Swiss-Prot record:
Residues 523-548 are annotated as: Disordered. It catalyses: guanosine(26) in tRNA + 2 S-adenosyl-L-methionine = N(2)-dimethylguanosine(26) in tRNA + 2 S-adenosyl-L-homocysteine + 2 H(+). GO terms for biological process: tRNA N2-guanine methylation; tRNA processing. This is tRNA (guanine(26)-N(2))-dimethyltransferase. Changing residue 201 to A: Abolished tRNA guanine-dimethyltransferase activity without affecting the ability to promote RNA strand annealing activity. PANTHER family: N 2 ,N 2 -DIMETHYLGUANOSINE TRNA METHYLTRANSFERASE (PTHR10631), TRNA (GUANINE(26)-N(2))-DIMETHYLTRANSFERASE (PTHR10631:SF3). GO terms for molecular function: RNA folding chaperone; tRNA (guanine(26)-N2)-dimethyltransferase activity; tRNA binding. It comes from the Eukaryota. GO terms for cellular component: mitochondrion; nuclear periphery; nucleus. It comes from Schizosaccharomyces pombe (strain 972 / ATCC 24843) (Fission yeast). Dimethylates a single guanine residue at position 26 of nuclear- and mitochondrial-encoded tRNAs using S-adenosyl-L-methionine as donor of the methyl groups. Also has tRNA strand annealing and dissociation activity independently of its tRNA guanine-dimethyltransferase activity. Its EC number is 2.1.1.216. The keyword Nucleotide-binding does not apply.
Length: 548
């Protein structure tokens, strides 16, 4: 089933790419359709479109819907509470007060106070797409999201703004989408606390826009942010660039994709903290060749105090790949009831050399150490995604699969390891994943997969037990010792005897639920040279602008 689903999805994306390429090459007027939007074009330089990113846009529509519905309920509840106070002050009858006693009753029975139209007006919201290009994303938001009052589709290039205006008029959403020419940072700085949703989808890093975005978004507003600079965020070739852009140094590791997401979240949190604002990650994903996060901004300075304890360093062994987290702060109950004491954390969690293999550690971070996702938000998104029309949302099955993976991740366990990689340290064949997971579960530890990598494992088991599991496995599945260098990390680990009792008895819950549900969980590369596209016509557009 998994292979069939992946084949169908790959074929669909490949067809979309081929169709688009053929249309571009024909020289005649053509159009592309994605979701509810239609983008006409007659010149390939007019449009910057990557069909592989349809998943990004489908997912974003789903996420904003989940956020807006939750927001609407809170706004209606507050409105109801105000009506109750007014009713009490006006000495209305007890019958009316009882009738409107709860938000549920208010929504169902108090249409004389707040009908559906006025409720929608109360819960309406604004969106800024700061780097709009063709306006495709803004048009989809206007046509597919309820209660959107206004969308500002901004771009710096004159030709891009003209294209946005043409596409907006073609899709009949000019009453909602307003094309705008301007610098993204300037637009956000001129409108502090103004936009309820800000979408940043730059070509490369979003770092230059974070400071303005955390100020421009409204209280409890939503930031939807993409970064495609994976070589910086997820590699080890540019740790100095990662540090200057995101405030933390990157490491070469098997968990590099989650590391990248946590670097981005840390950068957003650090930017917001300067203005007395805190972040609440709702959904944070490593997807294909980019990273996409949905973060709610909380205007509560008291929450900013938690950032120290939510930040961490990571110690990563250069030999065996084991790792340990070092929080930068800690919290404890204060002297008075309901208060919290904030203090520095103690450390380090490791010695200079790895206790398992003797190799040195490399240090990465700081990074975000809190949860990547919000459980209630994921539940809401999954419910919405189930009802999506697959004809409109072509990546529906993958959305469901990605959300299922995120939902089952251990929320309090940063980072993962890859079973085949740690087995390669010992020159051992890998045990079946369900058998390895069963051994961890039988010992009382918690285990999950990760959305970021297909064969990743997250667990609260200590590394000493992980190596004991593999040493016990090797007893029945011997390795060729002549293939292991005596100075290697693997030799040092195998020299030790297991100290824990390991039970490999199979457990049904060792199969992750997301796999059983049969969703499309991990995307295979559907086309050649798959990844972020170059900016077509950038030089032509720049030349046109210079001549105008």
């Amino acid at each position: 089933m998994y292979e069939a689903n992946m084949l169908r999805l790959s074929q669909r994306i490949s067809n979309a790419v081929n169709h688009f390429s053929t249309a571009m090459m024909s020289g005649a007027s053509a159009s592309l359709t994605e979701g509810s939007a239609i983008i006409p074009f007659s010149n390939p330089n007019e449009v910057f479109y990557n069909p592989v990113q349809q998943f990004n846009r489908d997912l974003s529509v789903t996420a904003i819907r989940a956020w807006s519905e939750t927001r609407s309920k809170k706004i209606v509840a507050k409105s109801h509470h105000r009506h109750q106070l007014l009713d009490q002050n006006s000495e209305l009858s007890q019958e009316n007060l009882t009738k409107c006693d709860t938000t549920h009753d208010f929504e169902k029975n108090c249409s004389e106070k707040t009908d559906s139209t006025s409720a929608d007006n109360i819960a309406g919201f604004t969106i800024l797409e700061a780097l709009s290009a063709t306006g495709l994303r803004s048009i989809r938001y206007a046509k597919e999201l309820p209660n959107v009052k206004r969308i500002l589709a901004n771009d710096l290039l004159e030709n891009a703004v003209k294209t946005i205006e043409k596409n907006v008029n073609y899709n009949n959403v000019s009453d909602i989408v307003i094309p705008n020419k301007g610098d993204a940072n300037a637009v956000m700085h001129m409108n502090k606390f103004h936009y309820d949703v800000i979408d940043l989808d730059p070509y490369g890093s979003a770092a230059p826009f974070l400071d303005a975005a955390v100020q421009s978004v409204s209280k409890d507003g939503l930031l939807c942010i993409t970064c495609t600079d994976s070589a910086v965020l997820a590699g080890n070739a540019y740790p100095e660039k990662c540090f200057s852009n995101y405030g933390g140094s990157s490491l070469r590791s098997n968990f590099c994709h989650e590391q990248a997401v946590r670097h981005l979240l840390y950068a957003i949190a650090a930017s917001a903290a300067k203005y007395g604002r805190a972040i609440k990650p709702l959904l944070s994903l490593s997807i294909d060749f980019y990273f996409r996060v949905f973060v709610q901004i909380k205007a509560k300075p008291v929450l900013v105090k938690n950032l120290q304890s939510q930040s961490l360093l990571i110690y990563h062994c250069s030999g065996c790949g084991s790792f340990a987290e070092q929080p930068l702060g800690k919290t404890s109950p204060g002297r008075l009831p309901g208060t919290t004491k904030f203090s520095n954390a103690s450390g380090p969690p490791v010695s200079a050399n790895c206790e398992h293999c003797g190799y040195v550690h490399h240090v990465g971070g700081p990074l975000w150490g809190g949860p990547l996702h919000d459980a209630e938000f994921l539940k809401k998104m999954r419910a919405i995604a189930e009802d999506l029309d697959p004809e409109v949302y072509g990546t529906k099955r993958r959305i469901l699969g990605m959300l299922a993976l995120a939902d089952e991740e251990l929320p309090d366990v940063p980072f993962y390891f890859v079973l085949s990689q740690i087995c390669s340290v010992l020159r051992s064949q890998s045990p079946p994943q369900n058998i390895f997971v069963s051994a961890l579960l039988n010992a009382g530890y918690r285990v999950s997969g990760s959305h970021a990598k297909s064969n990743a494992i997250k667990t609260n088991a200590p590394w000493s037990f992980v190596w004991d599991v593999l040493r016990s496995w090797i007893k029945d599945h011997p390795v060729k010792l002549e293939n292991i260098s005596k100075t290697s990390a693997g030799a040092a680990i195998l020299e030790k005897t297991p100290t824990a009792e390991v039970d490999f008895t199979f457990r049904p819950d060792s199969e992750f639920a997301s796999k059983k549900e049969g969703y499309t969980r991990y995307q295979m590369n559907p086309t050649e040279n798959w990844g972020p596209k170059s900016k077509p016509g950038k030089r032509t557009i720049a030349e046109v602008d210079s001549k105008s």
